[in-house]
């Protein structure tokens, strides 16, 4: 696995200085711009394009808290596993997922905009709490628990997307 933190010369940490990240991204992209390689041979152009792709992938990873966390876990455990394929062992959270999906379905059927707004706020609050817990687990090097929080965040991200879709459908009416 390519270390996205190393590409931008940043410390491996959950909290990333986004302004510094953007600044370094612009510098790297400027240095790798195709115009700089017009007179270069095909191999040099291909290498520059590959590096540019690596920079873009690293940026995507560092901007997304789930991907960033998974990168930290992989770098520290040496396991480049597909964390998305792990199923959560937290039965209480599995039950909560079912309840949330049912609640969202009921809100959509009843077309209750106030209930949807309240539900969205609760999901946002839960997401913030899990992000905080994830950061703590990463700081304590509890990689397995951190991976479980990544799974929870992935679900909450999908749920937030579904809430947005329901919101769009309600406002179309």
What are these regions (language model features)?
Residues 1-173:
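C-terminal accessory/regulatory regions appended to core domains
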